[in-house]
């Protein structure tokens, strides 16, 4: 089992609160794009699709259909110490005068409002790929905030494979992978056509990003 990196806080209660925040998906994606701009990225790619995600519940592995979202950039990347700081719930983000920084929710809180599993994968120039995962599965099991520096076998999903492959093609960059997107899974049950639902959500994201980042989008 991978080593666990402990963090501070009151885990289960805080985690449930994070999952129930009312942030819209397009606002969450905008916050991720904002981070990429801060990292001097020239390009940001958003991948939004469906996968079979496996949850570990009471020692049993339970597959279910769910959505994932990946934001990948070609920015400067983050070293392993930086990843630990970014993913720690005690960390705070600061902005200089040129930063957009207008969303005010932070990467961790905004991501957890949409997904139960959040993975940050990053690569600095001439460096190796590092990752940290903030897993609701692990937090609920152990009732403590922890970061996984390696993935459990069932966590090596299609979404992770895509992110790792895209980063391996670049000198540097970062990817945020949101999986087990609980709010979308709940809402999709009322839709007769999943593809239409997916395209509708993607359209909301695209329109919102075009409005917020009009000076950055080509």
Describe the residue ranges of each PLM region.
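Residues that line or immediately flank small-molecule/substrate-binding pockets and catalytic motifs
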Residues: 48, 90, 122
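Acidic ATP/Mg2+-coordinating residue in the GHKL
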Residues: 73
């Amino acid at each position: 089992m991978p080593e666990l990196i402990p963090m501070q806080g009151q885990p289960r209660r805080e985690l449930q609160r994070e999952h129930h925040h009312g942030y819209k998906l397009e606002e969450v994606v905008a916050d991720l794009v904002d981070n990429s701009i801060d990292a001097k990225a020239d390009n940001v790619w958003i991948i939004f699709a469906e996968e079979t995600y496996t949850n570990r519940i009471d020692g049993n592995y339970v597959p279910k259909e769910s959505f994932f979202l990946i934001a990948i950039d070609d920015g400067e990347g983050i070293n392993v110490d930086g990843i630990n700081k970014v993913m720690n719930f005690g960390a705070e983000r600061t902005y200089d005068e040129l930063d957009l920084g207008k969303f005010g929710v932070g990467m961790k809180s905004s991501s957890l409002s949409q997904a139960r599993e959040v993975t940050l994968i990053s690569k600095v120039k001439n460096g190796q790929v590092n990752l940290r995962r903030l897993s609701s599965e692990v937090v609920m099991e152990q009732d403590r905030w922890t970061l996984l520096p390696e993935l459990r076998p069932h966590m090596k999903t299609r979404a992770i494979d895509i992110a790792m492959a895209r980063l391996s093609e670049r000198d540097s960059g970062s990817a945020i992978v949101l999986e087990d997107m609980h709010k979308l899974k709940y809402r999709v049950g009322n839709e007769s056509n999943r593809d239409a639902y997916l395209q509708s959500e993607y359209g909301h994201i695209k329109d919102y990003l075009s409005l917020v980042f009009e000076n950055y989008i080509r």
